[in-house]
Amino acid sequence: MSVESAENNIRGVPTHGGRYLQYNIYGNLFEVSRKYVPPIRSVGRGAYGIVCAAVNAETREEVAIKKIGNAFDNRIDAKRTLREIKLLRHMDHENVMSIKDIIRPPQKENFNHVYIVSELMDTDLHQIIRSNQPMTDDHCRYFVYQLLRGLKYVHSANVLHRDLKPSNLLLNANCDLKIGDFGLARTTSETDFMTEYVVTRWYRAPELLLNCSDYTAAIDIWSVGCILGEIVTRQPLFPGRDYVHQLRLVTELIGSPDDASLGFLRSENARRYVRQLPQYPKQNFSARFPNMSPGAVDLLEKMLIFDPSKRIKVDEALCHPYMAPLHDINEEPVCARPFSFDFEEPMFTEEDIKELIWKESVRFNPDPPIN
């Protein structure tokens, strides 16, 4: 017997005594617990693999299932997966993606693929910006407010996202926004530089472009500013071809920093490098963004500041006059306890990480699987 998806005729084949169903989605095999039933459809793919929508037969809600294939082939990818699972399980906020399940593998010894189940969203901000759907100033305010509201919670958990960009901001038809993809997140106290992954350059703060290792939560605020500008102009603010071009685009808009603004750079080489760059005056933001409301322009100027210590903080941004129609301090919760990355031991092997992800799946599914 097979379970069939009416929508596109994707059939589920029972495996492991009927405890699991296997779906073939455009050549990708998905083996999931039997409670995840048709209609099954592909809703996206990325470097990590493929995402499908399915229905949880127990709750009748549609969910997203992300398959991370061969998740333990290298330590960096495996660590990223574990980090995201642990972080999202720790978080509980309307504007942060939540994990509903880690599908427990049928056999621990054959555990190679990780399936993360989360709420299903309709689209992401990148898709909306690139579409021809009209966006008003109210849309812009609502998107940025929710982003800041979620970020306040994330930062209060002692976590930096480090990779905020439109495609990581998930939306549904009501314009509700959730921050996703925490695979690059770090604690605010860590000072390791991002050697593992190439974070999208266009949304990176100047201190990261200049290899500053002791960065702060201000890196995420810079990214919010880039996103705010992109919502209004529907073009990336700083689409740099490389780091040098990226820094030039930044200084062409916000002006070249003076010496006082370079205090955060500990490296004399970095300061010397910035000083020898072509000098640009700051542009008039109102002229540069004629379609942006004055309040949004003012907030943008406070986010796009070269010196991270002078950049507006997330709490201050929520209190900014532009956010006044939505801001309510009592509806902007913080995280009850800080998140700890203690599980990330430097000596961890792929097998150690596999064991920890296995334990996460057992936490969601305590019943032993059929072998």
From Swiss-Prot:
The modification Phosphotyrosine is found at Y197. It catalyses: L-seryl-[protein] + ATP = O-phospho-L-seryl-[protein] + ADP + H(+); L-threonyl-[protein] + ATP = O-phospho-L-threonyl-[protein] + ADP + H(+). It holds the Pfam family Pkinase. The keyword Plastid does not apply. Activated by tyrosine and threonine phosphorylation. Its EC number is 2.7.11.24. ATP binds at V43, G44, R45, G46, A47, Y48, G49, I50, V51, K66. The active site is at D163. This is Mitogen-activated protein kinase homolog MMK2. It comes from Medicago sativa.
